[in-house]
Amino acid sequence: MKFLRVDHIDIVCADLKKSLEFYRKFGMHPEGTIDGGKTVFLFNGDEDRPVRIELHQAKPGDKTGIDHISFGVDDPVDATKEIKYLGGVKFAFEPFENQQSGRTISNSHDPDGVLVQMCRKTAAGTYKNWE
């Protein structure tokens, strides 16, 4: 198993509007929203060298900053089994199909506590029905 690419970076924002304005200056464009506009998916528009960021409005008490880094893999289910076999990694939950994103995902934490997600696009996803 190996990481194929960085799929996206998820950021929890103190002020979603300010963060959206900031990333737009770097050529990021909204692909859509979910959660009543409290989550915005950004894309650089380059399919050959894609950059994707998910911005989430922080809720009271939430820590702001990077929530997780998501890496694309061939198969998150097989990758999770392989890593469990090797030992030493605890997973936050078993792989599952996220209906909104159309991705199969699995989450674990690295030794420093960073949430690391493995994912694979498996369906269209309902978040394409932008709010």
Whereabouts are the PLM-identified features?
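N-terminal beta-strand motif that seeds the catalytic metal site of vicinal oxygen chelate
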Residues: 1-17, 66-69, 119-131
